[in-house]
Amino acid sequence: MHSSRRWIISALAALAVALPAAGAQAQSKTVRLAKQFGISYLPLTIMEQKQLFEAHAKKLGLNLKTEWVVFTSGAPMNEAIISGNLDFASGGVGPLLTIWGKTRTNLGVKGVSALNSMPLYLNTINPNVKTIKDFTDKDRIALPAVKVSIQAITLQIAAEKAFGPGQHGKLDPLTASLGHPDGLAAMMSGKSEITGHFTSAPFMYQELDDKRVHRVLDSYEVLGGPHTFNVIWATTKFYDENPKVIEAFIAALDDAMKQIAANPAEAAAAWVKAENSKLSAAYIEKLIRLPENEWTMVPKKVMVYAEFMSRIGMLSPKPASWSDLFFPTIHKLPGS
């Protein structure tokens, strides 16, 4: 965990020194993008591995170079984009809504596109926990970022449904911030205080392969159906000053998603290679083919999160619709 943090900090420092601030020129020639761990970021992995962004930019007359950085959660990514050390961020709906609310009157950060619709599972190694009501002070639930990650907010929505109005934060004291790989390792060791892990693919499926683990919560059940897990966001300044870069990015993202749908086996192999994963390409392909996992630009149930966060005081003002949260690039899509 500590080594990955040092790498991320070092990478950011290097980018901050080496690269000019976003929007320094009308069309940025070097674009800095960030992603996180997990197969939910598969389209970005395909874009990076096959240099699709550069290829589509070239069609528009741009000689584009890309710099990719990996984060463990959306919170530090937001710090990077606010400080001008990042052009495209990607993460959960929660961090997007948080930075949208905080920057409305200055940087104007908005979503460029949704990245996928995928469920999140809260798994546990504690046989006594059947529902979230069964967690006690002896349990600890790992998730990417306490209170602000999409997992944390989904847990709050579930807690309010389970314990009643005003009780959305009842389980917050039991949560701990850990990146997905570290959360998995901590719970599966059986020697950690971590007995629960609210995570994403492939980690949640890996955990359930172990007979000691069972699922306590499925985010699709909490929200009443498929919902957006990850989104991509940028500042209004970058969006306005780099129209061709945005056009190339959307084209590359669409290209990557089509390649995933057309050839899941090839996409799986590319992800395993890029992540230097110990998981087999066949295992990842199986996850890609699950009907519950979809890579799409269409935002789904983003307003469910927005309305909840607004009601409990985490988001102000409340967006009137999902399109308020995203740039016009995807307004024609049937979002929610």
What are the roles of these predicted feature ranges?
Residues 1-11:
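Bacterial N-terminal signal peptides that target proteins for export
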Residues 10-20:
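Bacterial N-terminal signal peptides
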Residues 21-26:
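Signal peptide processing junction and immediate N-terminal pro/mature segment
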Residues 27-168, 172-177, 191, 195-201, ...:
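Short, glycine-/small- and polar/acidic-enriched structural segments
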Residues 55, 75, 79, 83, ...:
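Solvent-exposed, polar/charged alpha-helical surfaces in well-ordered, non-transmembrane soluble domains
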Residues 181-272:
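Pocket-lining segment of extracytoplasmic ligand-binding domains
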Residues 239-316:
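Secondary-structure end/capping motifs
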Residues 309-336:
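Conserved C-terminal helix/tail region of periplasmic/extracytoplasmic solute-binding proteins
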